[in-house]
Swiss-Prot record:
Pathway: Purine metabolism; IMP biosynthesis via de novo pathway; 5-formamido-1-(5-phospho-D-ribosyl)imidazole-4-carboxamide from 5-amino-1-(5-phospho-D-ribosyl)imidazole-4-carboxamide (10-formyl THF route): step 1/1; Purine metabolism; IMP biosynthesis via de novo pathway; IMP from 5-formamido-1-(5-phospho-D-ribosyl)imidazole-4-carboxamide: step 1/1. It comes from Rhizobium meliloti (strain 1021). Belongs to the PurH family. Its EC number is 2.1.2.3, 3.5.4.10. This is Bifunctional purine biosynthesis protein PurH. It comes from the Bacteria. Residues 8-158 form the MGS-like domain. The gene is purH.
Amino acid sequence: MAVASKKIPAPDEVRIKTALLSVSDKTGIVELARALNDKGIRLISTGGTHKALADAGLPVSDVSELTGFPEIMDGRVKTLHPGVHGGLLAIRDDAEHADAMSAHGITAIDLAVINLYPFEEVRAKGGDYPTTVENIDIGGPAMIRASAKNHAYVTIVTDPADYSPLLEEIADGATRYAFRQKMAAKAYARTAAYDATISNWFAEVLDTPMPRHRVLGGLLREEMRYGENPHQKAGFYVTGEKRPGVATAALLQGKQLSYNNINDTDAAFELVAEFLPEKAPACAIIKHANPCGVATAPSLAEAYRRALACDSTSAFGGIIALNQELDAETAEEIVKLFTEVIIAPSVSDDAKAVIARKPNLRLLAAGGLPDPRTPGLTAKTVAGGVLVQTRDNGMVEDLELKVVTKRAPTAQELEDMKFAFKVAKHVKSNAIVYAKDGQTAGIGAGQMSRVDSARIAAIKAEEAAKAMGLAEPLTRGSAVASEAFLPFADGLLSAIAAGATAVIQPGGSMRDEEVIAAANEHDVAMVFTGMRHFRH
């Protein structure tokens, strides 16, 4: 049953006479308190905040003076008291509330400056279970929510970034309703995000990826100029997950990344991370979240050249992801072509100097590579809901490949198969990828018909061969990967016509036997992975 409101009109201006300050992040708190004190505002504080203000020589009362009760249980209980919450929640123009305050000696609190225990930080650093639990704030969120609910009379500030706007607002000693309402909205968003982080942490600890209530929280890193298109508004929210990538990378040069830059850079870096840096240098070039070319080689510069060769036309204005430190030789190759973003685990000083010749080129150092096997979640909004799933962390190296044809693949074909399947995992469905000797030969993406994807990939391979001055297409003697099963033999026959000699696919079609028979008829080796990689 809903609680009835007395509907007492909120005043516009509220004079600030008493302020409660209780913060974990003490950035700027002494300066703020000094400014409040200069305005004759009474300061009340708790624990470490009280000590910081007292040490700064400021006149500050301990919260126990409001409660008549000492801080107990290692600080777990200090503000959970009617003396505090009555002062925050009282409707000042309600006679009954005013009488209750008078009867119980409750002081009205006009301003609350509160931030929370660093749960997100402790969780991100991998704190042990008891330490992480101990950093779940109880009193802080309670005071924030109480203050925000009573924003008709109380101003709540939860972010040090709002200290300056607060001081501007109270230049005449009062806050206006519009300001208090805005701060209340920010406060509820803060506690919601805080609780979301706690809830999601417990879901991880208990291995419950799909709990009854799933809250997706994040902190606005930046408002973007626009979204996918200029008429769409956009913002970049970060979750606090420390997975190396575009959200955690350092921008070494270049202007702000756009919405599309971030989306494409994430896709590129997740793809190139499939290739272990200790095994071989690798490069992936991405446009519109699809790979144009991917390659490994003895050197990073050669890997870039081989990736570029697959589709140099589409690579123009693309995103380049590397699995090793960007060196000067590779940088010299990259600056020959217009590129939007480069992301690598690190960047050498010599490479920075080279890239600096292209000041608009965005250069990111991620500090490492994401582990493709790490569990996580992805989300997609739909009308009226959110689709949530675990990250596709399936790895072809972990699968038991099943040879289903008379001819088994050669050792080289098997390597090419695995390479192609890794790439196909990151191509929009329907996906077909030809690969040979650690290089994509042709990529067909996003077609409604799988056979059309095979044909497009073959056309790309022919165009690449012509550009390279080769007599035959790159698909000759290649392996071909399909991210989902081949429903008919036509897709296989198209790949065979392009020159593929080996096929890797999940299998599982009602017509598997028909497809296997076609492969045997053309002496093509085929393996089933048993794992699909749809990508939409």
